[in-house]
Amino acid sequence: MDEFHRCGKEDSFWQQCFLYPLFFQEDLYAISHDHYLDVSSSSRPMEHLSSNDQLSFLTVKRLIGQIRQQNHSIVLFVNCDPNPLADRKKSFYSESVLEALTLVLEVPFSIWSKYSVEGMNESKSFRSIHSIFPFLEDKFPHSNSILDARIPYSIHPEILVRTFRRWIRDAPSLHPLRSVLYEYRNSPDNLQRSIIVVPRVNTRFFLFLWNYYVCECESILFSRLKRSSHSRSLSHGSFPQRTHFHRKIKHIIIFSRRNSLKSIWSLKDPKIHYVRYGERPIIAIKGAHLLVKKCRYYLLIFRQFYFHLWSEPYRVCSHQLSKNCSSSPGYFLRVRMNPILVRTKMLDELFIADLITDEIDPIVPIVPIIGLLATEKFCDISGRPISKLSWTSLTDDDILDRFDQIWRNLFHYYSGSFDRDGLYRIKYILSLSCAKTLACKHKSTIRVVRKELGPELFKKSFSKEREFYSLRFSSKAAARSQRERIWHSDIPQINPLANSWQKIQDLKIENLFDQ
């Protein structure tokens, strides 16, 4: 990999590298064999594992020949036999070949992505999903409209192969990829007869396809937006759900009402800002309504002519930030005016001026979260706590741990909102639901449970916010916590409740356009 990278920097050798001979390297299949055993051992029971899972390189070469000959007796994606032990040897070799194919294709892709980032010094990828909010804090208040787009999932296999040819000139190395893609497209489980590229599929091959597909879309889109806009540069950042990360925030970022914010992205005359979390890109635009309509039209045409995809209208929707709330990952987002009183003393006279600035105001969706808690049987539809009957068979420690995990995730994820009063209502619902669950388990009352357990009942589950401030900040900083928003660098994914609410919001948008 280092040799490929060195050659790629010097003479763009990575565009012309011959990858097909790598398919016949025994070391490559030894790596894929070990990786497959590691993954399968974590998902299969111990009685299904065997010490005879040895890799035969001759069998691998026969399977490669079958792929080249379009022999569909090899099945890489479907196991039609319900017996997990039947035909396991065949599945073992198929997975090894698929793993090796992914490893070979990852070589030029990783070089290309690193080379483009180091050469352009523009793309920024962060591990924590909270990294999206400092970007919004810094860029979105200066915009007046946003385009909420979604990356299409379904794509034809030949389009993927054609885009691979842009940076892989070794045509024989693409024949196995084409065969594998068409085999998946024609498999009985694939009812849509297309390649569904999603970031949530937990396989190395589909994660690679997703990373490649997103990078291909963004690299072309950025260059087109730069040419079409009058700004000298385009600010953009890509966030979680990717397997390759070039930069990482290592510390917690605190934004205060009173302190001026230091710019993270230093740009000259920016007018278009692009941010993506998962499969949802957001483009913020500062300009007239006609410019917003042109950008929306351009995105639809771009997908239609470059990827041969017909995008539904709801997949690219526009609205003004000053009038509407946008649903970002788990938050309601709006831009509000923040008046600041400034006193300037010159000699004996005192001048008072009012400055009005715009700032992003993340709002916790309390009512939808309570509705989701009611769906999960923690409370009724009005928010009244009830016992979690399905957990009464667990031990007391397990019950406390589960409520503790729910509250800790909610509190950490929504710590970036100034108004956290609604979170304490959710805390009340969870704490009383925990007490009722324990009371139902022991066939007693809440008063008896509190008397028996005493302060230990909620000491473990519902004091995490105090521990958080005491461990990470001084007492003075903890006193200012009500006027500060805190973004964390250790949140790799959206909170499950927030993710469920986000899906409901997306369905509402789809139904609105269907009517």
Swiss-Prot record:
One of its GO terms (biological process) is mRNA processing. It is found in: Plastid, Chloroplast. Its main location: plastid. Keywords: Chloroplast, mRNA processing, Plastid, RNA-binding, tRNA processing. One of its GO terms (molecular function) is RNA binding. GO terms for cellular component: chloroplast. The keyword Plastid applies. Usually encoded in the trnK tRNA gene intron. Probably assists in splicing its own and other chloroplast group II introns. Belongs to the intron maturase 2 family. MatK subfamily. This is Maturase K. It comes from Pinus coulteri. The gene is matK.
